[in-house]
Design a protein with these regions (language model features):
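Intrinsic-disorder/low-complexity detector
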Residues: 1-121
Length: 121
């Protein structure tokens, strides 16, 4: 039985969440955390999801209308943060990093990767 007033995440995010359903006040934080984990996972595979692809993940899911834009934004911010953190973590080979960075930033990936590393200190 599904608890009233709770919401599930898209399948791609749900596998990175601590449980299946969330109350409205928990949803944004859960989406940000799951987005970070998804970004990390995608970076390791050198796959980058566009904003449109991430919005598409939510199609057919019931979200509270007053929260939907913030949920999508928090998911995206988490995803971008997780992707960047994976690139600068030191846990990937240089080849993996260059492939993932190019997937994320295109031709200017070297410059943007350098900036990401500088931001991280």
């Amino acid at each position: 039985m599904v608890a009233r007033g709770t919401y599930s995440l898209p399948e791609e995010l749900a596998r990175h969440a601590p449980r299946e359903r969330f109350a409205p006040d928990e949803l944004r934080g859960a989406c940000r955390e799951a987005g970070e984990a998804l970004g990390w996972e995608d970076a390791r595979k050198a796959t980058f999801r566009t904003a449109a692809q991430m919005v598409e993940m939510w199609r057919r899911l019931d979200l509270p209308a007053w929260e939907a834009p913030y949920i999508l934004r928090d998911t995206r911010l988490g995803y971008l943060n997780g992707y960047e953190r994976a690139l600068i973590s030191g846990e990937m080979s240089e080849e993996q990093i260059s492939n993932a960075a190019e997937s994320r930033w295109g031709q200017r990936w070297r410059e943007r990767l350098r900036a990401a590393r500088e931001r991280s200190g």
